Amino acid sequence: MAASMCDVFAFCAEQEPARRTVEIRFVSSGKGKGLFAIRTIRKGETIFQEKPLVSSQFQWNALYRYRACDHCLRSLETAEENAQRLSGNAHVLLPYPELCTVRNGLHQQCPRCQVTYCSAECLKAAAEQYHQILCLETSRDNPAHPLNKLEEAWRNMHYPPETASIMLMARMVGTIKQAQDKDWWLHLFSQFCNKTANEEEEIVHKLLGEKFKGQLDQLRRLFVDALYEERMSRWFTPEGFRSLFALVGTNGQGIGTSSLSQWVHACDALELPPRDREKLDALIDQLYKDIEKVTGEFLNCEGSGLYLLQSCCNHSCVPNAEASFPDNNFILHLTALEDIQPGEEICISYLDCCQRDRSRHSRQKILRENYLFMCSCPKCLAQADEPDITSEEEEEEEEEDDAELEGEPEDAELEDEMTDV
């Protein structure tokens, strides 16, 4: 590729506008680098759009029939098909079907293994980057294939709600093995935040639970069997594999796509007579109520990716920007939540909306356990004198989170969460 060895803008959809808008600066030894505005950025403005270096759908999400493009994670169901499955009602009919952007006629399959892509462009992109190495050919349903054994082992260790994917690491390896310029890709992956050995162990512990040491060694052996490459031999050692695991656990950006959500946003933009608007809004409200009863919180095709420029954004509990996926694929849009002045740091939140509303103590606990830092944003500094206590409701939620980490959920619980999806 033509990009320079240190080009953090290489995967932006429009590189030059991004270069004129933001820059990378060193912040501190604790924070490392950060993303800063070069010019005034207005509230609601898209700061940049970026493709990931690699991405992958979560294993359980794919297993439970959340059909997504194997490359860009675009939802392959039409909005109506999506609504029918999520609500458990095959008779759901959506008005304004022309607002759905999914085109089944464009879908393509790998001729060797039959995985599905949303378009010929995605099939080609995957084949050129990593799929020639990772294609299962006729062994897609063969449990003895090394890659299938690796995926099965991962599913038995990391249950919903999912936060990482072993196949993201596999695609990193596949990308380098298949690349002509292997050093370029190795350098790109080296740009992501690295941790000390003790910090890496904490991240692995968080992802795999109490038995993480034995599980990590099992995963590493399967990873070696499936993907070993001499050029990246360090990644396959116990220390290197732990580092690779921690890199994905710390830097992986969650991706969510939904053809139904995209259709709803398109409906919101329609100019309708008041009575028609009221009728449409009532239909959508009832649909989401029905979906919540059947599906709960699992609405999207979900996965994670590594984004070179976006990974430079530090956290704040009062972010001035947010990442989203409005195109129903893996293209990340970073959007300003408020006016941002030249020289001001651009921060996102690593916490969801509910977590940001928790007490300072609870927020710090989540950030410390998942990202290994203590937040010093304006909100946390303003609340520094608050006692280190949590509400009863927050304690219950934390106990549930901790219980998920301690071991495997019961099969019945999984069925309750994801049945009929």
UniProtKB/Swiss-Prot annotation:
Residue span(s) of domain SET: 20-351
Recorded family membership: Belongs to the class V-like SAM-binding methyltransferase superfamily.
Species of origin: Xenopus laevis (African clawed frog)
Zn finger region (MYND-type): 97-135
Xref: InterPro entries: SET_dom, SET_dom_sf, SMYD5_SET
Any matching Pfam family: SET
Segments of this protein annotated with the region Disordered: 386-421
Gene3D superfamilies in UniProt: 1.10.220.160, 6.10.140.2220, SET domain
SUPFAM superfamilies in the record: SET domain
Protein name: Protein-lysine N-trimethyltransferase SMYD5
Function as written in the Swiss-Prot or TrEMBL entry: Protein-lysine N-trimethyltransferase that specifically catalyzes trimethylation of 'Lys-22' of the RPL40/eL40 subunit of the 60S ribosome, thereby promoting translation elongation and protein synthesis. May also act as a histone methyltransferase in the context of histone octamers, but not on nucleosome substrates: trimethylates 'Lys-36' of histone H3 and 'Lys-20' of histone H4 to form H3K36me3 and H4K20me3, respectively. The histone methyltransferase activity, which is independent of its SET domain, is however unsure in vivo.
Binding-site residues, S-adenosyl-L-methionine: 350
Gene Ontology CC: cytoplasm
Keywords on record: Cytoplasm, Metal-binding, Methyltransferase, S-adenosyl-L-methionine, Transferase, Zinc, Zinc-finger
Listed EC numbers: 2.1.1.-, 2.1.1.372, 2.1.1.359
